[in-house]
UniProtKB/Swiss-Prot annotation:
Its main location: membrane. Endoribonuclease that initiates mRNA decay. It is found in: Cell membrane. InterPro entries: HD/PDEase_dom (IPR003607), HD_domain (IPR006674), HDIG_dom (IPR006675), KH_dom (IPR004087), KH_dom_type_1 (IPR004088), KH_dom_type_1_sf (IPR036612), Ribonuclease_Y (IPR017705), RNase_Y_N (IPR022711). Pfam families: HD, KH_1, RNase_Y_N. PANTHER family: RIBONUCLEASE Y (PTHR12826:SF15). The gene is rny. This is Ribonuclease Y. The chain crosses the membrane at residues 4-24. Its EC number is 3.1.-.-.
Length: 540
């Protein structure tokens, strides 16, 4: 029984041992397999880690290289930016240096120009001093010659008186009379020579200054010559327009004439209407209004009044603009607006065919140039020259001469006293209180006498020529007189038996004085006296 029990137990123990060994063997194999797999996996992981490490190292190396490259590029870019900034800075510095050099150069040029101007003025002053010295020397020389001649004349008179008294046993008074009669011709000759010499000296001195003034001023302003007229012509598209201008029972033309103050002349002349009136501003307003009415086509009293008002406003604006333009051209900045408007009216005023506004501008420039040459107030001189004929703008509206009206306007609008005196004295009506007034007279004469500056009507022209010849013929010894060169020269033919060569100069001087006293004329008149004596002998 015990064997029966031990056998199963032994079998069980053996089974357990066999199972344990088999299990251990199986587990050992499994463990070995797992260990091999683990070792394989470890190797694989290690290889993968190594490859990843290498990849990381390569990536790090590439990143490091890229960073180095980026750093180098950034460094280069910074260097380039710095170089560019340095270049720009250098350019700015160079530009500033160039600008400063140019400014220094300009200042040097201005200084050189001022030095040249000062040197020029110094040379002019030296020339004037030398001229004055020469003139003083000449005057002293002439005075010495005159004194010497007077002494010689007294000596000759004494000698001849004594000789005649001794020879002819005449009284002293009779001898003196004979001597004085004989010396008369000689004294006349000496007087003529002195007049001629003085004229030549004055002319030689004045020519240079006159040329300079005329070149400086007249070349910068040339006033056109226009024909003085009292009519304006308006062209019509056709003759049918004349009836529309006249209107029913003449109401249109009557309304137009009443509003404008001009006469409308409609005659047989084809396609034209004539506007007649002495006031050029009214004629201009009427012309503009009529031209607009013709263009518009609607012509009736209400439309006429509208167009006339519009034309009057336009002309008034043009007048003010003309006055402002004259002030700007001469550099005058302050003037009463009403005086500017009155000045602009001179645009429509003429004198001997010369536009008065252009003439006034020219006189202003000439006066300014001469004042600057003499060291006077140039601004006041220009102002006085511009306003010297201001009275002519309204002399047909207000009683009085243009000089009186100009003086009243200048005082009313508070012009300087020197300007008022220059206006009042430019026709020698009152004494001149300053050199500027003298310069205005000279500039007015130069502008008026400039060739082509003025003209006159045919009737006045013929009357002036006749008066010129009559004055010349009224002197003793004159045989014939001819006015030539449009009345700018009078040639006088004298009888050689009655007028000596010495007396021709005195005769020319006397005729010149009478012309200045008795006549009014534009510009200058040259007096030429011609004495001719012929001796004829016939050989047979």
């Amino acid at each position: 029984m015990i064997n029966t029990i031990l056998v199963p137990v032994a079998v069980a123990i053996v089974s357990v041992l066999v199972g344990g060994c088999a299990g251990y063997s199986l587990r050992k194999n499994k463990w070995e397999t797992q260990a091999q797999n683990a070792a394989h996996d470890a190797k694989h992981i290690l290889a993968d880690a190594e490859s990843k490490a290498k990849a990381v190292e390569a990536d790090l190396a590439s990143q490091q290289e890229a960073m180095k490259k980026a750093a180098a590029d950034a460094k280069k870019e910074k260097i380039l930016e710095a170089q560019e900034e340095i270049h720009h800075y250098r350019e700015r510095v160079d530009n500033e240096l160039n600008e400063r050099r140019q400014e220094v150069s300009r200042q040097e040029n201005r200084l050189l120009q001022r030095e040249d101007a000062i040197d020029h003025k110094d040379s002019l002053l030296d020339q004037k001093d030398s001229q004055l010295t020469q003139k003083e020397n000449q005057i002293k020389k002439l005075q010495a010659q005159v004194l010497e001649k007077e002494k010689r004349a007294d000596q000759l008179v004494t000698e001849r008186e004594q000789k005649l008294y001794e020879v002819a046993e005449l009284s002293q008074e009779d001898a003196k009379k004979i001597v004085l009669d004989k010396l008369s011709d000689q004294l006349v000759k000496e007087r003529a020579e002195m007049i001629e010499e003085s004229n030549q000296l004055a002319k030689a001195k004045a020519d240079h200054f006159a040329r300079k003034v005329i070149v400086d001023a007249i070349q910068s302003s040339a006033a056109d010559t226009v024909s003085e007229k009292t009519v304006s012509v308006v062209n019509l598209p056709n003759d049918d327009m004349k009836g529309r201008i006249i209107g029913r029972e003449g109401r249109n033309i009557r309304s137009f004439e009443a509003l404008t103050g001009v006469d409308v002349i409609i005659d047989d002349t084809p396609d034209v209407v004539v506007l007649s009136g002495f006031d050029p501003i009214r004629r201009e307003i009427a012309k503009r209004a009529l031209e607009r009415l013709i263009k518009d086509g609607r012509i009736h009293p209400a439309r006429i009044e509208e167009m006339v008002d519009r034309a009057r406003k336009e002309v008034n604006d043009d007048i003010y603009e003309a006055g402002e333009s004259a002030l700007m051209e001469l550099g005058i900045h302050k003037m009463h607006p009403e005086l500017v408007k009155i000045l602009g009216r001179l645009k429509y005023r003429t004198s001997y065919g010369q536009n008065v506004l252009s003439h006034s501008i020219e006189v202003g420039k000439l006066t300014g140039v001469m004042a600057a040459e003499l060291g006077l107030d140039e601004k006041i001189a220009v102002r006085a020259g511009l306003l010297h004929d201001i009275g002519k703008s309204i002399d047909h509206e207000i009683e009085g001469s243009h000089v009186e009206i100009g003086v009243e306007l200048a005082r009313k609008y508070h012009e300087p006293d020197l300007v008022v005196n220059a206006i009042a004295a430019h026709h020698d009506d009152v004494p001149k209180l300053s050199f500027i007034a003298e310069l205005v007279v000279a500039a007015d004469t130069i502008s008026s006498a400039r060739p082509g500056a003025r003209s006159e009507s045919l009737e006045n022209y013929i009357r002036r020529l006749e008066q010129l010849e009559t004055i010349a013929k009224g002197h003793i010894g004159v045989k014939q007189a001819y006015a030539i060169q449009a009345g700018r020269e009078i040639r006088v033919m004298v009888e050689p038996d009655k007028i000596s060569d010495a007396r021709t100069t005195i005769l020319a001087h006397d005729i010149k004085n009478q012309i200045e006293q008795d006549m009014e004329y534009p510009g200058n008149i040259k007096v030429t006296v011609i004495r001719e004596k012929r001796a004829v002998a016939i050989a047979k």
